[in-house]
Swiss-Prot record:
GO biological process: carbohydrate metabolic process; chondroitin sulfate proteoglycan catabolic process; heparan sulfate proteoglycan catabolic process; hyaluronan catabolic process
Principal place of residence: other
Catalytic activity entry: a beta-D-glucuronoside + H2O = D-glucuronate + an alcohol
Name of the protein this chain belongs to: Beta-glucuronidase
UniProt-annotated location(s): Lysosome; Endoplasmic reticulum
Domain of life of the source: Eukaryota
Entry GO MF terms: beta-glucuronidase activity; hydrolase activity; protein domain specific binding; signaling receptor binding
Provenance organism: Mus musculus (Mouse)
Record-stated family: Belongs to the glycosyl hydrolase 2 family.
Gene: Gusb
Key words of the record: Endoplasmic reticulum, Glycoprotein, Glycosidase, Hydrolase, Lysosome, Signal
Glycosylation site positions: N172, N416, N627
Regulation of this protein's activity per its record: Inhibited by L-aspartic acid.
InterPro entries from the UniProt entry: Beta-gal/glucu_dom_sf, Galactose-bd-like_sf, Glyco_hydro_2, Glyco_hydro_2_AS, Glyco_hydro_2_cat, Glyco_hydro_2_CS, Glyco_hydro_2_Ig-like, Glyco_hydro_2_N
PROSITE patterns named among the record's database cross-references: GLYCOSYL_HYDROL_F2_1 (PS00719), GLYCOSYL_HYDROL_F2_2 (PS00608)
Amino acid sequence: MSLKWSACWVALGQLLCSCALALKGGMLFPKESPSRELKALDGLWHFRADLSNNRLQGFEQQWYRQPLRESGPVLDMPVPSSFNDITQEAALRDFIGWVWYEREAILPRRWTQDTDMRVVLRINSAHYYAVVWVNGIHVVEHEGGHLPFEADISKLVQSGPLTTCRITIAINNTLTPHTLPPGTIVYKTDTSMYPKGYFVQDTSFDFFNYAGLHRSVVLYTTPTTYIDDITVITNVEQDIGLVTYWISVQGSEHFQLEVQLLDEGGKVVAHGTGNQGQLQVPSANLWWPYLMHEHPAYMYSLEVKVTTTESVTDYYTLPIGIRTVAVTKSKFLINGKPFYFQGVNKHEDSDIRGKGFDWPLLVKDFNLLRWLGANSFRTSHYPYSEEVLQLCDRYGIVVIDECPGVGIVLPQSFGNESLRHHLEVMEELVRRDKNHPAVVMWSVANEPSSALKPAAYYFKTLITHTKALDLTRPVTFVSNAKYDADLGAPYVDVICVNSYFSWYHDYGHLEVIQPQLNSQFENWYKTHQKPIIQSEYGADAIPGIHEDPPRMFSEEYQKAVLENYHSVLDQKRKEYVVGELIWNFADFMTNQSPLRVIGNKKGIFTRQRQPKTSAFILRERYWRIANETGGHGSGPRTQCFGSRPFTF
């Protein structure tokens, strides 16, 4: 490696370390190892919504000080799940305010008696604001519904010692102009029309504001001297893979640190010592996207071992992929080769579970993505679960990782209070997802009012901050503003633009799509000279509704919209368009309105994951593009299980 590159990596490491100090501690995904144990708390929790007028009865009566059932009637609530669709009560489905969860966990004796062991409580997602107590003692608070947070509860559970601990979590789903996403509480004061004290939650985003414990809650242990964080950056010189790492160890300043890199067969291909360094991998197997290489998604394992002078040892294994990302004036490059985003936008959304994590649904979705020939998706409009990103790493599905910056439309949402929180959210997001090879770009917002005057400073500050957190990935936000009015566009690396020609305007006029889309692309590129992704397009289709000639909301109309977009995209992808992401992968729930028939129906699959006509149109297109661009997929591959084919 050249001295120039060595100096760059040293400088980069110093910058990453300085940026990481903005957040206290790392956020490694909890997993078992020879030194770590894990206890999942998924299952039924006690649950109670605070129905008092001010929603503060739980705090006033200190429900956290005794078992929740002693405060009044409780429900059984599954975790993970949203609470909204679990009962038959519309009042709970639409509830705004504080809800309370409680669970008692039985602790292994060694957890409570071994003072050389840390016991950590981790909540992977609590939407939106959460306050947590253990045995009635406050341990942590967190704002934001999509990223994990932790509390070291060792002293609490080892002071007895105890055999159980009672975990109480209060969650408030109220959104304000300064939350992410923003919202507004509107009080209806006309008592001739509304009950006294009546209020509703207004939002400017088009999905249901599901709430609750959406992902797993776990207890895990580490030694008192432990691996706190790992940052990995990869590069390639000729056929040598370069893996630069920085490792944070907490609990002691006197330790030895060993690092090994193993290939998929378990063979050690490189090793090092010390808390920072660089591993060189001759003839490295690169991480390639699905359909871009005959062996996509190659993953190595970085095994880290820390040993103290007292012989306390901690182990952690981090899966990594060796790959590079770069952007030119008209191309998006992965490992130096042009990459075209042929993908979808998604939502974490399903029947009954709401936004609750569900393994069967997740695996089904990935099988559908590969059936489509899709190689990418955007985490619209918030960070998805870590398990989603782990599967993307394993399957080669490229990710545009989006924060919850959706619905930023009011002027007050561009103020300093909102900006401070947005910066913190990006720090949390980068800290969590920085080591995933599938993540190739950060998105800091979706459809903000970026033509407002404060947007220029807001997005310049936000994007500069995100780039300082991660120098290796491009940064974007998704715009629906006019090309010559968007004040944030000068600061992004890739233009992402949403448009719904013949849908939200020129209703039913399919003939305007191609000229309007062509003008859109030419205007954006002429103005900004950056690669462009068509980050949203589509039309609602009610399953089973057929009209010929096509009419809005029929499957034929959705099909015709896609075909008209594709005609222009086929021309522009030869120039500067680097991707297309259909809106949406599947139908999803929204607030009730005259414009939504039990949710948004722009999915190419139903909410139950059954294909509409447009799914077959997109499948044919994506496999054709993969073949035309030299992808390694001559068509869908079929694996047989008995007499039934399973296509993936």
